[in-house]
Amino acid sequence: MGQKVHPIGLRVGIIRDWDAKWYAEKEYADYLHEDLAIRKFIQKELADASVSTIEIVRAVNKVIVSLHTAKPGMVIGKGGSNVDALRAQLNKLTGKQVHINIVEIKKPDLDAHLVGETIARQLEQRVAFRRAQKQAIQRAMRAGAKGIKTQVSGRLNGADIARAEGYSEGTVPLHTLRADIDYAWEEAHTTYGKLGVKVWIYRGEVLPARKNTKGGK
């Protein structure tokens, strides 16, 4: 089943944390739709800023949004102009006070979302799908990945019948829950239709923090 389960969802609560941290009862649906609107708006406004993860934490009439990006300078802008404009737009969208935290991704070649995004953009620029995948794998392994697997599916090279083709290097232990595996999928919009891009990156093992029990044991 490790091949079929979402690698991140399988590890939430073990070595991964939730991307949205809040609790609600009657307002649950409203908050969920608001989260989706925030994420969609940020992804549209910062499409070229290499934004990977968007974390949302809620307090009373306050929303804290943490943006993980490989290009913090582009998100912040000159003198903070871009982030101020983004904050004002999110305040208007949600009707609440929004705080924005910028978190820099120091190794973008180890982030599955950014690697998948790079492959997708290359496919849109008519780069050969095998070359795009192999280059991404080489960069990830040089950056310190223990293993990486990529897959591109769809009408490859304009073929009449859609198929999937992938490459891998190193190990990607999907069944090991303590394995830090980052996973993402992206879409490339080509003249022959959409191509799907999937990326799995194994970054090493993480031992879950031992929880304190009563009695200090």
Curated annotation (Swiss-Prot):
CDD domains reported in the protein's UniProt record: KH-II_30S_S3
Gene Ontology MF annotations: mRNA binding; rRNA binding; structural constituent of ribosome
GO cellular component: cytosolic small ribosomal subunit
Record-level GO BP terms: translation
Domain KH type-2: 38-106
Transmembrane segments: none
Listed Pfam families: KH_2, Ribosomal_S3_C
Matches recorded under InterPro entries: KH_dom, KH_dom-like_a/b, KH_dom_type_2, KH_sf_prok-type, Ribosomal_S3_C_sf, Ribosomal_uS3_bac-typ, Ribosomal_uS3_C, Ribosomal_uS3_CS
Keywords noted in UniProt: Ribonucleoprotein, Ribosomal protein, RNA-binding, rRNA-binding
Complex and partners: Part of the 30S ribosomal subunit. Forms a tight complex with proteins S10 and S14.
Function: Binds the lower part of the 30S subunit head. Binds mRNA in the 70S ribosome, positioning it for translation.
Stated family: Belongs to the universal ribosomal protein uS3 family.
UniProt-recorded name of the protein: Small ribosomal subunit protein uS3
Species, as recorded: Streptococcus thermophilus (strain ATCC BAA-491 / LMD-9)
